[in-house]
Amino acid sequence: MTDLPFTLDQLRILKAIAKEGSFKKAANSLYVSQPAISLQIQNLERQLNVSLFERGNKKATLTEAGSLLLRYGGRILALCEETCRALDDLQNLQGGTLIIGASQTTGTYLMPRLIGLFRQRYPQVAVQLQVHSTRLISWSVANGQVDLAIIGGEVPTELQDVLQVTSYAEDELALILPKSHPFSKLGDIQKEDLYRLRFIALDTQSTIRKVIDKVLSQHGIDSSRFKIEMELNSIEAIKNAVQSGLGAAFVSVSAIAKELELGIVHWAQIENVTIKRMLSIIVNPNRYKSKATETFSQEILTLFVTPSQHKILSDKL
């Protein structure tokens, strides 16, 4: 067989330089000397008979050939990492790392408990949690940067044919008010009363905001008429704003358990309106699924669904 004109170490160096933007920073990230990685790149360029970086730029900029090699080299390195993980799995969860993604609310309020339960049973498995928007996390799963993710919204349209989505539980979204608000003394509030409230809201691109607007619209409520006092990108900031009397807000029930227990906000029921969204596990079915990934998925199903549902959802996963 003809020898390959590059090594895995050379591909790792190329990837590090492209990521860090300079040979010096790449050398530091790889814990090697700058002359060593410069020599590796020179050898690689000679073996391939191409220039991989633009000369004369302060920033390490890839040439067209360099970008092409990086694209395919990244796939080669990812496949090598999958191979190593598959071999590690032969030891039946005796170690390894599970990288979990989560959207903002689930990552902040749900995942710490789930990861804690998983670590109690499998302490030898290291767990990393990445919390971002549903869109970013979905792309991380698609690209293989995350093993699986728990999200509370829909995956981006362009990824719906790429990712496998398994819905496992409902998450109710509650309308919360300051305890001092007059409506907190009422029973159910009427739909028309919503137009009299001042709202603290997530930005319009958040998945929770989209779910809320959609469900309210189905009940004949036009959320575009709401008085939005301010938009924030943090659930904690929104809760603090409500507690301070700045307005009302829709948040996940999982995010206000402590506040309800302490009685510092009021959960207002809207007459004949319940807002719920589905929580889902997403994976990339075209990538290797480690035993840790499969086991964590099964643990979630065991916690949240009935035995009959568990069998159906397990078959999907």
Curated annotation (Swiss-Prot):
Q: Which residues bind DNA?
A: 23-42
InterPro entries, sorted:
LysR_subst-bd, Tscrpt_reg_HTH_LysR, WH-like_DNA-bd_sf, WH_DNA-bd_sf
Q: Cite the PROSITE patterns for this sequence.
A: HTH_LYSR
CC terms in the record's Gene Ontology section: chloroplast
Q: What does this protein do?
A: Trans-acting transcriptional regulator of RuBisCO genes (rbcL and rbcS) expression.
Membership in a protein family:
Belongs to the LysR transcriptional regulatory family.
Q: What is this protein called?
A: Probable RuBisCO transcriptional regulator
Naturally occurring in which organism (per UniProt): Pyropia yezoensis
The UniProt gene name for this protein comes to rbcR
